[in-house]
Amino acid sequence: MDISFKNVSYIYQENTPFEHRAIEDLSFTIGSGSIVAIIGHTGSGKSTLIQHLNGLTIPSRGEVRVGDFVLNQDGKPKDIRNLRSKVGVVFQYPEHQLFEETVQKDIAFGPQNFGVNEQEIKERIASILPSVGLSDSVLERSPFDLSGGQKRRVAIAGVLAMKPQVLVLDEPTAGLDPRGQKEMMTMFDHIHHEQNLTTIFVTHNMEDALKYADKVIILNKGQKFMEGKPLEVLRQREKLQQVQLDTPEVIDFIDKYNHRFHDNLIYQNESIVDIAAEMKRRLDGGQHE
């Protein structure tokens, strides 16, 4: 689904002494099937932005379009329920939202509330489990008896059981160790391509934005600060420093190598291990002193 924000502002407690502009005059487009990273510090407007995508928040000014759905200051569209079935949101620490007696009931909760029949729900669960790295042996277990990582995967399965066309991820790797972060992002990348989704993820991890996103949008104090292809945006060190953000470590690594050895090695979405191997090959080949 195509997504667009046109001059969108959201004002908390408007016309009161506590008025606060969470986002201001945001305009951008997200093409169907793309992966977009939203980056910014706490208070930059990231969470408010993504809450507009399924109508949890309605613009104070401007217009949001998600496919054929339109959200503006006139209020929520009449078919808001349909919109929410098509936009799946995985909030931070989604495992905290588990509540049913069994894993199966938790995953089935959303589809049941949207009138999906039992047979269809069973088929959806069976197809989703491998995608999130779970086996059917967990279905009759209490979600509260699972490990933290398994709980998160169950919560994600519950969102995917709705068969969304848009997947919104709010800090999907929060609280995970480096290995868990890598596994989680690899899983989402696979799901994105397997199900042909439009995916938006909020992140503080510049490496993930560089590796997985087709587009990066950086927010600062509720306004769009930068937008573009990841490599073009995330290598602009001086501009990023204006909003207390750093370039990805892999870009720093390549830039320092190129400066030291007068080379022109270019980042092409390789791992740091592969890049180091290429550097060694060049140096061993005597290309540089």
UniProtKB/Swiss-Prot annotation:
What EC number(s) does this enzyme carry? 7.-.-.-
Chief subcellular location equals membrane
Signal sequence range: none
| InterPro entries reported for this sequence | AAA+_ATPase, ABC_transporter-like_ATP-bd, ABC_transporter-like_CS, ABC_transpr_CbiO/EcfA_su, ECF_ABC_transporter_ATP-bd, EcfA2, P-loop_NTPase
Q: Which domain of life is it from?
A: Bacteria
Q: Where in the cell is it found?
A: Cell membrane
ABC transporter domain span: 3-246
Q: What are the alphabetically sorted keywords of the record?
A: ATP-binding, Cell membrane, Membrane, Nucleotide-binding, Translocase, Transport
Q: Which SMART domains match?
A: AAA (SM00382)
Quaternary structure annotation from Swiss-Prot or TrEMBL: Forms a stable energy-coupling factor (ECF) transporter complex composed of 2 membrane-embedded substrate-binding proteins (S component), 2 ATP-binding proteins (A component) and 2 transmembrane proteins (T component).
Name listed for the protein in its UniProt record? Energy-coupling factor transporter ATP-binding protein EcfA2
Gene name of this polypeptide: ecfA2
